[in-house]
Amino acid sequence: MKVRTNTPQLQQLRRDIFELILAEHPYNCLTCAKNLRCELQAIAAYIGLEKISLPPIHRQFPVSEDNPFFRRDYNLCILCGRCVRACQELRGIRAIAFIGRSSETMVGTAFNRSLADSGCKFCLACVEVCPTAALIDSVPFWRTNQSKEAYVVPCRHACPAGIDIPRYVRFVSQGEPGKAVAVIREKVPFPGVLGRVCIHPCEEECRRAQLNEAISIRALKRFAADHDDGTWKQNSRMAAPTGKSVAIVGSGPAGLTAAYYLAKLGHRVTVWEALPQPGGMMRVGIPAYRLPREVLDREIAEIVSVGVEIKLNHKVESLEWLWKQGCHAIFLALGAHRGIRLGIQGEESPGVIDCVTLLRHVSLGEEVTLGQRVAVIGGGNAAIDAARTALRLGAKEVTIVYRRSRAEMPASPEETEEALREGVNIFFLTAPNRISHQRNRLQLECIKMELAEPDASGRRRPVPINGSEFTLEFDSVIAAIGQQPEIPAQFQLRTTRANTIEVDPATLSTCIQGVYAGGDAVSGPASVIEAIAAGRKAALSIDRYLGGSGNIEEELVPKEKPDPWLGRDEGFAYWKRVAMPSLPPKERISSFCEVELGLNREQAAFEAQRCLQCHLRLQITPLTLPVGSSPG
């Protein structure tokens, strides 16, 4: 028996039926957001429909924008039922269904409730399967400059190191922190450090924030690291020795990350560190109340365990000397350890210190005396760290002087809030004019500022208000307006106007063959995660330079196919972010004990279960259209 599926009669029947569908569809293709991406256009081209003879039927269904993620225009709906099946059968949420009767039939929620009240989890499977623009992203990805993956899973795309955030969050939600930390360690050797001090750009992009509050991704990373069972080591691999040697200058996050991956690739790696303890700015720039030293020491020990040698108290002054040690490549991860001067009269007075020096002295256990009243000049994270450190050193009154408003303050909002809770005062729109030393006290003359048009940084430029000068008295003044690298002239490297090392951004190679540079020495003061990303890139480039493949990727936990079934959870849209438990302010300022205490298992699981699991949308296989049906 032969079954014919493309006879002239069947072709005409398809056109007739398709005309019935299009009769109720608005004729606004040219202005539709899905123009040239609409399946109706593709089918019309495939079946050869050239005109519509039936009179149009104008439906007057409402257009709903009751959520921040997508738009619902049921005038464009063809009642194919894909979205309903995706919600009910693929996800198990049952937030939408067919409602109404006859010509009033449409897709909606029970009792016309909002999506949030109907149990929707905003996974956007419905949007992915919709053939028209009836359900469409508020801003379709093709109207952005992003790839679909970056648009759909912005948290993963925002991570400089490329950590698979949805995957490890899912493992935490399932009560498997060992697998979660394995996923994190596939990209970084410092999960515990990042779980405490990462600037979390992923959270800034988290789509859940558009609903209520972002997932506490950093806290979940810390939970996974704190519950590391070490099983990831079973899948960790070491390459055979290559006979090549790499010298790394600086044991900060960039240097140690590069060292870790290069050692695993079989190279002999020696890290040269000028300080008496390893860790760079992780040790001497971040106070212990934010990053306990035992956490840092434990993760550095893992790096040493793969064969990395760290030589302390060795300040490298010459590249020529390094070459003579027998290395085949050099990576400069010098950090940014020099504080920037205030540029005002009197800053050389006794009692004035830059925050980089202060934090280094405190971190290395050296004696520091600040007195009872301390001023901190600046508005970044270093200024906040210096102010909170001053409290812990016994200061009774700590005042931050910042020339812009709080809205322009570059410091982390949560760190600023914690400083205020601890009793730090902040004078906004205030700038220092000069410092004088009188009667064993520092007189800090300040002037009030107002904000004008934005400057090159994008922030509104502060300008002084004439006649608004006033004077404050302090025992110490801490300058915290920035820091920069110290690049020895003997290195003979090309540098920028900001005194950072000039490199090829694609490879991090310098003007000298075989010499690479990264981290704060190249970017200027940045974050731990950005430095780690630079260390990864350097390891890749150096391995290729030494004849390797440059493949530093690892699979520490076997890949699995995520379960598309989400199930129904009443009130999901309203689940609030779990607050990080912490020491009371009065208790914390008496020591350098860690302030944040970490989530327990129940808190971590609940917080992880708040995830929208945006990545599941990418698991839906794109529709394969018939040959010759592309509307474009």
Give the residues covered by each predicted segment.
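Feature captures the FAD/FMN-dependent oxidoreductase FAD-binding
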Residues: 179, 240, 245-249, 297-344, ...
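Mid-to-C-terminal Rossmann-like scaffold of FAD/NAD(P)H-dependent oxidoreductases
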Residues: 147, 151-155, 417-423, 431-438, ...
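Rossmann-like dinucleotide-binding cores of NAD(P)H-dependent redox enzymes
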Residues: 268-271, 275-311, 362, 387-434, ...
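Fe-S ferredoxin-like electron-transfer domains
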Residues: 1-270, 274-275, 282-289, 300, ...
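Glycine-rich dinucleotide-binding loop and its adjacent helix/turn
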Residues: 223-240, 298-315, 339-393, 496-511
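FAD-site-proximal beta/loop scaffold in flavoenzymes
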Residues: 348-372, 454-525, 529-533, 540, ...
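Glycine-rich Rossmann-fold phosphate-binding loop(s) that bind the pyrophosphate
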Residues: 249-254, 379-380, 520
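Conserved hydrophobic helix-helix packing surfaces used for dimerization/oligomerization
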Residues: 246-248, 269, 374, 398, ...
